[in-house]
Amino acid sequence: MTLLNRGFFILLSYFFIDGNINGKENRLHTFSHPCMGTIFKVSVHSEKSRNKVEDIVQGSFKIADEMDDRFSDYSAESEVSKFNKQESHIPFRISSELLELLTISQSLYHKTSASFEPAAGALTQLWRLSRKTKRLPDQKTLSLAIKASSFASLIIDRKNKTLTKKNHLTRLDFGGIAKGYTADKMLNYLQEHDLKSCSISAGGDVIVGNPPPGRLYWIIRINPFGDSNSETMRVKLSNAAVSTSGNVEQFIQIGGKKYSHIVNPKNGLGLTTNHAAVVISNKGSMSDALATSISILGKSGLKILDHFPNTEAAIIDLNDNKVTKSPNFNKFSK
């Protein structure tokens, strides 16, 4: 099945959420907040006053900032950065949030055959340098980073809430799950404060609660080109999440070869295959992490969905412009 023209890319800022309804009493309120290197956008349908809605939404943005303070590997003062500086074989005390994210990540690591690798910080740091210098890492440095980039190099003590690295080069990088996990937290907060009909978008991740009044679902349009004339993929969701991942939007060319910003933890280099993925799941953490994993694995990545109930995916092969979907993906198509 061919859906998209040649040259397709996912421009993550071009997610649109349709949820407008007529009527003065139940209004749509939208708020934005910069965090985690992107813009978190919250849309809410509510009969409450805008001031009351804004107070609640600001509380959800505070959660996003708190998660960024814990999980960012760009901030030297974050919890993750402090762990990354820790020497090997010395237990590091961790927060409940980091322990929870590690637990989720550990399950994903095993179920995705390690294509989701949150302990690949040494590789992502090395690849950031390569993107800056436009030179591939030397083989010795790359080999050491690959060896260190494994969840198996971590020891999690859940009782005492500590994390220990076996290899001093091991680094955490939650770039493939942090936004989705944070959006889950924000959604829970909003719904606990009686804002049931809401949506949160953050880069390539969108998570929604109850549909707008009078609707059965939210309609989310994924625009590949970022202009009104291009073809879109539309999905319908209620209390679910959708994430995208693609390697065409950001790439570098080294030695005449194109490399993605997405790192394959198996070889430590950016992807060279033209794949883009769309994943729908019941949690933002799941859709976020699996979108990256399936981008790395390609069409074979759809097989890992056997381990994830209530999850569907579509992968676009940009070499032949074809879309391969999991068996029940079309039930979300609009």
Model-found features: residue ranges?
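Mature catalytic core of soluble alpha/beta enzymes
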Residues: 2-334
